[in-house]
Regions:
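Short, polar/charged alpha-helical segment
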Residues: 29-52, 61, 65
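Short beta-strand-to-loop elements that line the ligand-binding cleft
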Residues: 50-58, 148-156, 170-176
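A conserved helix-loop-strand patch within extracytoplasmic ligand-binding domains
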Residues: 96-146, 249
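Short helices/loops that flank or line small-molecule/ion binding pockets
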Residues: 45, 60-74, 87-88, 136-138, ...
Length: 266
């Protein structure tokens, strides 16, 4: 009888361990649109993941949450922003999936064509370093400003307003917190808005933007990011594979109509 009890104890222990593994929650911080929507779709197609989506609100730094262990991954940022955050926080993170692009767009409630922009028009742009640079390159691509010589590749040269060489319309560049820019549309002539914030505001980038960032060779693909210690965690790897799957790519294409563009799962 005592001999028989050991296998039973082993079975009980195995069941308990299996339960604990299954119960382990994978907490991922994400912007509400489209990131959290995409993650919630993953929950539907892969019930083996015990995924908890933490929707970010303004003022919360998802990389600080990750560094502090409050979440196991985040999904909201592109590589240039991530690299700036690593420097600012003194942390090293790990990219485990490259998922989609949200083209930056120029929007207006005042004009219907960029040719109609008046002299000394006000332009709201993101105030964080990487997206500010991205906005200036978009304004240059649409003929509104010209940056200094050599500023042709946003992946290589980060631009600031001091790098504007030509501003023929004397545009006034106003740096604003990215989530607040859609609310400023009635107060400025032009607004350069990140794709996710445009979608949250009810805009359709592929239709409403007067100028839209090209997806070709775009360095701003959105990433699933974790810590080096967790990058080989089975749940993290499973989520990464799901996000880069053809199913998720199809979901993005069908639901965002060119306003969000998949870069994996083609």
């Amino acid at each position: 009888m005592r001999y028989a009890s050991f296998p039973l104890a082993g079975i009980a222990l195995s069941v308990a361990l299996a339960f604990n593994v299954q119960a382990a929650e994978l907490r991922v911080a994400a912007d509400p649109v489209p990131h959290a929507e995409i993650l919630n779709y993953v929950k539907k197609i892969d019930p083996s993941l015990n995924l908890k989506v933490i929707e970010l609100t303004s003022g919360i730094n998802a990389n600080e949450l990750l560094a502090n262990g409050d979440v196991q991954a985040n999904y909201f940022q592109h590589a240039p922003y991530l690299h700036d955050q690593e420097k600012a926080l003194g942390q090293k993170f790990a990219v485990v999936a490259t998922v989609h692009i949200e083209p930056l767009g120029i929007y207006s409630h005042k004009v219907k064509n960029l040719k109609d922009v008046k002299d000394k028009a006000t332009v709201a742009v993101p105030n964080n370093v990487t997206n500010l640079s991205r906005a200036l390159y978009l304004l240059q691509a649409n003929g509104l400003i010209k940056l200094k010589e050599g500023f042709t590749d946003p992946a290589k040269n980060q631009a600031t307003p001091q790098d504007i060489a030509e501003n023929p319309k004397q545009l006034k560049i106003l740096e604003v917190e990215s989530p607040q820019i859609p609310r400023s549309l009635d107060d400025v002539d032009l607004a350069v808005i990140n794709g996710n914030y445009a979608l949250e505001a009810g805009l359709v980038p592929a239709k409403d933007a007067l100028g839209l960032e090209s997806a070709t060779n775009n360095p701003y693909a959105n990433l699933l990011v974790t810590t080096p210690a967790l990058q080989n965690d089975p749940q993290i790897k499973k989520l990464a594979a799901d996000l880069e799957s053809p199913q998720v790519a199809d979901f993005i294409r069908k639901n965002y109509n060119g306003s969000v563009i998949p870069v994996a799962g083609q």
